Regions:
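The feature marks the first
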Residues: 5-54, 61
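Physicochemical signature of membrane-embedded alpha-helices that form the seven-helix bundle of GPCRs
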Residues: 13-20, 41-52, 76-86, 107-124, ...
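Alpha-helical transmembrane segments and their immediate juxtamembrane boundary regions
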Residues: 28, 56, 91-94
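Hydrophobic alpha-helical transmembrane segments in multi-pass integral membrane proteins
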Residues: 87-96, 155-170
């Protein structure tokens, strides 16, 4: 009888997923590369990268543990994972739509709107992750890998939020500030890559504390 192949969710896989997704976003939004390959190719890279994010976020949600702690309160770790997972799905919609959306309405409703909503959810996710640190007294632990990871991740969320604001679709079908949108997307992607890379050396199969 053949042995069943099974991939077990782990922090290492989560980190690798976010790092792979971040690489695609960083390459697609990096000015010289984006100019060389064109917007269509960049959009394809974003779409591929968004699925790296979604896969990693799904693993994170699985590892986050129960929704509530023993006192019945919603756990910050679960809130961070769940909001991020939904945000990545919205990025799937946005980046996928960007490949074929040509009308102004399509760009506004199918590309920018889910991008903005996903960015808001990423900001909430980053805030919940910091709340989880605060609940265990680690909100200021600069030498701690988790502290570094969470704050760098929050910086990435802020960068993605700025990108969404800069990418508002104008009346002629362009974006408000294409250069700012691209560079903050690239910065955010680099932050997300670094946030995962910093904890990868110590990644194991453990889940978060059920209390936070």
């Amino acid at each position: 009888m053949s042995k069943r192949f099974e991939i077990k969710p782990s922090l290492k896989l989560q980190c690798l997923g976010f790092m792979i997704g971040s690489m695609f976003f960083a390459v697609g939004s990096f000015g010289p590369i984006s100019a060389a390959i064109g917007s269509d190719a960049s959009n394809v890279l974003f779409f591929i990268g968004s699925w790296g994010f979604t896969g990693a976020a799904f693993i994170q949600l699985q590892l986050s543990g129960p929704t509530r702690n023993e006192r019945g309160a919603l756990r910050a770790v679960w809130l961070a994972a769940s909001t991020q997972f939904v945000g990545t799905i919205l990025f799937n919609v946005s980046t996928g739509s960007a490949i074929y959306a040509h009308s102004i309405n399509a760009k506004q409703d199918l590309v920018w709107a889910p991008d903005a909503e996903g960015s808001v959810l990423f900001l909430l996710s980053g805030a919940f992750a910091l709340l989880a640190l605060a609940r265990v007294g680690r909100l200021w632990k600069p030498r701690d890998r988790d502290w570094v990871s969470n704050w760098v991740n929050m910086a990435g969320c802020v960068a993605f939020g700025i990108s969404a604001v800069a990418a508002v679709v104008t009346s002629n079908g362009g974006v408000e500030n294409a250069s700012l949108a691209a560079w903050t997307t690239c910065i955010g992607a680099v932050c997300f890559f670094a946030a995962s890379a910093v904890v990868l050396p110590e990644a194991d199969d453990s889940t978060a504390s059920a209390e936070i």
